[in-house]
């Protein structure tokens, strides 16, 4: 393989690593409202999102999933403001958005393969994470163990998520 092609593949791998890192940080920072537009493909055929909680096929279904997560964060913020009114007094819901919850998914043991034509790629990551929730029964904390399997597509000069499975 010519040196230029090897360098391009190395750069593609680095861009995909960074894309997934930014995606998981966006989850951690509760930026679900913007995740679809920033990280997901916008033109490729049949994008899908697979999770233990459901399988979402098509642009509308995936957007609806992230919107539902955003609405859940809004609801949780209001609940925390109500339950901890003295500690949150003077703060707006926008300032407190995402508080009380930690959804950390550090990526490890990556495998990234770029297709021969350089237009698609596959990636796999093992995840040992931690989640903290706050609900009507109070705080809950637990470990999560899972795997990301992701197909990427080169679209408009950048790598984008095309199919993502997290189980």
Protein language model annotation of sequence segments:
Residues 19-22, 108, 147-151:
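Short, hydrophobic/aromatic alpha-helical segments in well-folded domains
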Residues 27, 40, 127-129, 165-166:
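Short beta-strand segments enriched in hydrophobic/aromatic residues
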Residues 1-42:
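Short, low-complexity N-terminal intrinsically disordered segments enriched in polar/charged residues
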